[in-house]
Swiss-Prot record:
This is Peptide chain release factor 1. Keywords: Cytoplasm, Methylation, Protein biosynthesis. PROSITE patterns: RF_PROK_I. InterPro entries: PCRF, Pep_chain_release_fac_I, Pep_chain_release_fac_I_sf, Prokaryotic/Mito_RF, RF-1. It is found in: Cytoplasm. The keyword Protein biosynthesis applies. The modification N5-methylglutamine is found at Q232. SMART domains: PCRF (SM00937). GO terms for molecular function: translation release factor activity, codon specific. It comes from Chloroflexus aurantiacus (strain ATCC 29366 / DSM 635 / J-10-fl).
Length: 360
């Protein structure tokens, strides 16, 4: 591990020297390339140099233990214990930093929420989840754009497709894909019986046009009059867009977008969703081919996987992937997802470390 760290630090210094050269400083493309590469390894280099400084501090403290002054020796012992703890912490941090990064972590995200089993109560729960993710995004200053929304007429959501734009959006929300289950007494339940309902969530990284090739001949594009929420017509022009990829084949994908201001905007958004779905399909195929373990796929987003239960009577949220419970359910549904996401990231990192076999 430390040989690799030394090589990364040497490359960082080399990049600094390269960017100072006149022929590079005047070449914008090359300068940006070097700057991007340096940013990607900056955290590793900073942690490694702090590790080296901590090692030196330990050596100095050990030398002070030989001093004749008992007070100085006591101070040295205290410093030694502090620095050794810091060294162990930095070593774990470096192991994590050396793990391959998910190339999608910095991307924006596309989310799809659909009501599952449970009728109207499932649709109401889907609306709760949509509000939860919207509030979570807003608390971070991220932008939310709705591509398509189908309501059930009583405040519930049958299906919603939306995009979240913000730094690291996918890295935070990629763990939300799967089946979410709610246990509560519906407002319409006169006898106070607890009902169980579900909603499915899909999480997709937004994909650049250059990352996925889509042939025009594989598409059928329909335009129609946009409908308002609840099915009410609101538009006198054919602004809504439906894109069908490879219609009539097993590979068919249908994407509809009608919440944009124009047909052009709806078409662009629909293509964005289509690219994301095709990318996700390719990723899932690749994972199956290499036999990736389920433990290493906490954020796989498979819709058949029950990932979390929201138990209202007991004010308890259980994430089944990590076997951990969380309280204060109303706050979580109001967007306070930080503790849950942090626990999932810690679990995922630990599993990746175990699978990688990184050692010193």
């Amino acid at each position: 591990m430390f040989d690799k760290l030394a090589a990364v630090a040497a490359r960082y210094d080399e990049l600094t020297e390269l960017m100072a050269q006149p022929e590079v400083a005047t070449n914008v493309t090359l300068l940006q390339q070097y700057a991007r590469e340096q940013r990607e390894i900056e955290d590793i280099v900073n942690a490694y140099r702090e590790y080296q400084a901590t090692q030196r501090a330990i050596e100095e403290a050990e030398a002070m233990l030989e001093d004749s002054d008992p007070e100085l020796r006591a101070l040295a012992q205290e410093e030694l214990e502090t620095q050794r703890k810091r060294l162990a912490s930095l070593e774990e941090q470096l192991k994590l930093l050396l793990l391959p990064r998910d190339p999608n972590d910095s991307k924006d995200v596309i989310m799809e929420i659909r009501q599952g089993e449970g009728g109207d109560e499932a649709a109401l729960f889907a609306a709760d989840l949509f509000r939860m993710y919207t509030r979570f995004a807003e608390s971070r200053g991220w932008k939310v754009e709705v591509d398509s929304l189908t309501e059930n007429g009583i405040g519930g959501i049958k299906e919603v497709i939306f995009q979240i734009h913000g730094e690291g959006a996918y890295s935070q929300l990629k763990y939300e894909g799967g089946v979410h289950r709610v246990q509560r007494v519906p407002a319409t339940e006169a006898r106070g019986r607890i009902h169980t309902s579900t909603a499915t969530v899909a999480v997709l990284p937004e994909v650049e046009e250059t990352e996925i090739e889509i042939k025009p001949e594989d598409l059928r594009i329909d335009v129609f009059r946009s409908a308002g929420h609840g099915g009410q017509g609101v538009n006198t022009t054919d602004s809504a867009v439906r894109i069908v990829y490879k219609p009539g084949t097993p590979e068919e994908i249908v994407v509809t977008c009608q919440d944009g201001r124009s047909q052009i905007q709806n078409r662009e958004r629909a293509m964005t969703v289509l690219r994301a779905r095709l990318y996700a399909r390719e990723q899932e195929k690749r994972q199956r081919e290499i036999g990736a373990s389920r433990l290493a796929q906490v954020g796989s987003g498979e819709r058949a996987e029950k990932i979390r239960t929201y138990n209202f009577p007991q004010d308890r949220i259980t994430d089944h992937r990590i076997g951990q419970n969380f309280s204060n359910l109303p706050a979580v549904l109001d967007g306070e997802l930080d503790k849950i996401i942090e626990a999932l990231i810690i679990y995922d990192n630990a599993e990746r470390l175990r699978a990688s076999g990184v050692s010193t």
